[in-house]
Amino acid sequence: MRILHLVLAPRLSGAEVLAKDLAIHQQRSGETVGIASLVPQHDDFASLRVELEANSVTCLFPTKLHGPLGKLWHLDRMVRRFRPDVVFAHATIPAFYARALPIAAPVVYVMHSAANDFERGLFRRVERMLSRRARAVIAVSPANVDDYVGAIGNHPLMMVIPNGVDMARFGDAAHVERGPRQTQPTIVQIGRYTTVKNQLQTVHAFHDVAKWIPAARLLLYGVVEDSAYYQAVTELVNRLGLADRVVVGGPRSDVSSLLFDANVYAMPSRSEGHSIAFLEALASGIPVVASAIRPFAFAADFASVQLIDTDDTQAYTQALVAALSQSRAQRPLAGLTLKDTADRYMAVAHRVIQAATT
């Protein structure tokens, strides 16, 4: 089977990382797999591209930024070149472009968004026109289904497939050659700099954590999606006198090492789809403090996981302090591994290809 994954931009973010992991898994399983994008590769994706190419996954990324017609032209060329049997379009904008072209292969729209894309009138109108051009719609969480049905209506083939994590990459066994962990109490948050990820609240809470645990430090890493928000985080760190204890950094590809070395993972998101970052933290065993939102509820009873109202600074502070004294834990992630997710995607691929030929 020839499988093409389409993303908006090759970057270190959830949808793109899942597409990369699926592509490599499927290629290793004997399929012929490519990954295409609508805009050029971000610098932070370089190491992931090396990994893709080392596993013989074809990368079809434009070398310059195009307007809407240019994006359609580029995508048409890439589809003709790759000749896919099925296209998985990851996120709403790539799914728009894939369905706007007369692509013979069935298109599967994968809803990754943490927010409701269809609150925007334009997106709602376009999706209503293109909805049936998708042979299937995959939602990564039940909230995505609710958003779609509420704004667009029912789709003939719609299902929830949770994201999955590569367990082998995040367990302690992956770091046996690293030696012992560093000993400084460390809290880490990894995610795009945007209001929905709520890094500002983590900085406020950490200001109080540092009063209880003077040796503690905070590491923030992620794609700078909102430069004004990133600047606000940096300014708050400086204003609170935390510059020597807080790192406000860009995206990192060595997430498993960061989780191995840190003591607590913070995730005060206001909304999520089905977060890859949250799954990676759970797989690593690190104590987790996260917001009590619906997509995280499945982990509420897991060891060393606290789901709280992270907008309550005092409660958030107390949870972080408590987590710094907790032990790492093994969590039951059956059904949430990369293999589980890849198997479900392959089942969808077989189903839509069969339907297209009958």
Residue locations for each model-derived region?
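A conserved mid-protein helix/loop that constitutes part of the nucleotide-sugar donor-binding site
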Residues: 13-24, 185, 192-211, 218, ...
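Glycosyltransferase donor-sugar binding loop
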Residues: 36-43, 190, 217-231
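N-terminal strand-loop element at the rim of the active site
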Residues: 5-69, 158-160, 229
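Short His-centered aromatic/hydrophobic patch
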Residues: 89-95, 111
